[in-house]
Amino acid sequence: MVKAVATVRGDSKISGTVTFEQSEENSPTTITWNITGNDANAERGMHVHQFGDNTNGCTSAGPHFNPHGQTHGAPTDEVRHVGDLGNFKTDAQGNATGSVQDSHIKLIGPLSVIGRTVVVHSGTDDLGKGENEESKKTGNAGTRPACGVIGIAA
């Protein structure tokens, strides 16, 4: 079992943790989040980005992790960036907890997300279904108020 964690924070009040667990290379990865400080009753996009670099804030993380050169999509779409995690929903206090399994996200093997960055976005991800070119790149998910590099967990 490989476990990894990202401690998410940034220039905003948003903070939290995103954990990843994978038992073997061909098994799905369980992604669990506990994020606070968002807008109340909102959906916010979350993605794994290419680089584990936060030297210039979350902007340094680069584009979505996309080793197969696909267009942006929903986590359940076959055609999507590997890093497309979709949206999480916040409660009346702006907090979000949840868990999902994803067969594209890997901790083991050449496409591991360890060392890359999880970004929490300021808007709702349109899952590549928007009517403009940006939708196919970013899902129109907005700015990057919080992020964290994915590291190996104990």
From Swiss-Prot:
<feature type="binding site">
    <location>
        <position position="64"/>
    </location>
    <ligand>
        <name>Zn(2+)</name>
    </ligand>
</feature>
<dbReference type="GO" id="GO:0045454">
    <property type="term" value="P:cell redox homeostasis"/>
</dbReference>
<dbReference type="GO" id="GO:0005634">
    <property type="term" value="C:nucleus"/>
</dbReference>
<feature type="disulfide bond">
    <location>
        <begin position="58"/>
        <end position="147"/>
    </location>
</feature>
<feature type="binding site">
    <location>
        <position position="64"/>
    </location>
    <ligand>
        <name>Cu cation</name>
    </ligand>
</feature>
<feature type="binding site">
    <location>
        <position position="121"/>
    </location>
    <ligand>
        <name>Cu cation</name>
    </ligand>
</feature>
<feature type="binding site">
    <location>
        <position position="84"/>
    </location>
    <ligand>
        <name>Zn(2+)</name>
    </ligand>
</feature>
<protein>
    <recommendedName>
        <fullName>Superoxide dismutase [Cu-Zn]</fullName>
        <ecNumber>1.15.1.1</ecNumber>
    </recommendedName>
</protein>
<dbReference type="GO" id="GO:1901856">
    <property type="term" value="P:negative regulation of cellular respiration"/>
</dbReference>
<keyword id="KW-0049">Antioxidant</keyword>
<dbReference type="GO" id="GO:0016670">
    <property type="term" value="F:oxidoreductase activity, acting on a sulfur group of donors, oxygen as acceptor"/>
</dbReference>
<dbReference type="GO" id="GO:0045944">
    <property type="term" value="P:positive regulation of transcription by RNA polymerase II"/>
</dbReference>
<keyword id="KW-1015">Disulfide bond</keyword>
<feature type="binding site">
    <location>
        <position position="81"/>
    </location>
    <ligand>
        <name>Zn(2+)</name>
    </ligand>
</feature>
<feature type="region of interest" description="Disordered">
    <location>
        <begin position="124"/>
        <end position="144"/>
    </location>
</feature>
<comment type="subunit">
    <text>Homodimer.</text>
</comment>
<keyword id="KW-0963">Cytoplasm</keyword>
<dbReference type="GO" id="GO:0005758">
    <property type="term" value="C:mitochondrial intermembrane space"/>
</dbReference>
<keyword id="KW-0862">Zinc</keyword>
<feature type="compositionally biased region" description="Basic and acidic residues">
    <location>
        <begin position="124"/>
        <end position="137"/>
    </location>
</feature>
<dbReference type="GO" id="GO:0005829">
    <property type="term" value="C:cytosol"/>
</dbReference>
<dbReference type="GO" id="GO:0005507">
    <property type="term" value="F:copper ion binding"/>
</dbReference>
<dbReference type="InterPro" id="IPR018152">
    <property type="entry name" value="SOD_Cu/Zn_BS"/>
</dbReference>
<dbReference type="GO" id="GO:0031505">
    <property type="term" value="P:fungal-type cell wall organization"/>
</dbReference>
<keyword id="KW-0560">Oxidoreductase</keyword>
<feature type="binding site">
    <location>
        <position position="47"/>
    </location>
    <ligand>
        <name>Cu cation</name>
    </ligand>
</feature>
<dbReference type="GO" id="GO:0006825">
    <property type="term" value="P:copper ion transport"/>
</dbReference>
<comment type="similarity">
    <text>Belongs to the Cu-Zn superoxide dismutase family.</text>
</comment>
<keyword id="KW-0479">Metal-binding</keyword>
<keyword id="KW-0186">Copper</keyword>
<dbReference type="InterPro" id="IPR036423">
    <property type="entry name" value="SOD-like_Cu/Zn_dom_sf"/>
</dbReference>
<feature type="binding site">
    <location>
        <position position="49"/>
    </location>
    <ligand>
        <name>Cu cation</name>
    </ligand>
</feature>
<dbReference type="GO" id="GO:0006882">
    <property type="term" value="P:intracellular zinc ion homeostasis"/>
</dbReference>
<comment type="function">
    <text>Destroys radicals which are normally produced within the cells and which are toxic to biological systems.</text>
</comment>
<feature type="binding site">
    <location>
        <position position="72"/>
    </location>
    <ligand>
        <name>Zn(2+)</name>
    </ligand>
</feature>
<dbReference type="GO" id="GO:0004784">
    <property type="term" value="F:superoxide dismutase activity"/>
</dbReference>
<dbReference type="Pfam" id="PF00080">
    <property type="entry name" value="Sod_Cu"/>
</dbReference>
<dbReference type="InterPro" id="IPR001424">
    <property type="entry name" value="SOD_Cu_Zn_dom"/>
</dbReference>
<dbReference type="GO" id="GO:1902693">
    <property type="term" value="C:superoxide dismutase complex"/>
</dbReference>
<dbReference type="GO" id="GO:0006878">
    <property type="term" value="P:intracellular copper ion homeostasis"/>
</dbReference>
<dbReference type="GO" id="GO:0050821">
    <property type="term" value="P:protein stabilization"/>
</dbReference>
<feature type="binding site">
    <location>
        <position position="144"/>
    </location>
    <ligand>
        <name>substrate</name>
    </ligand>
</feature>
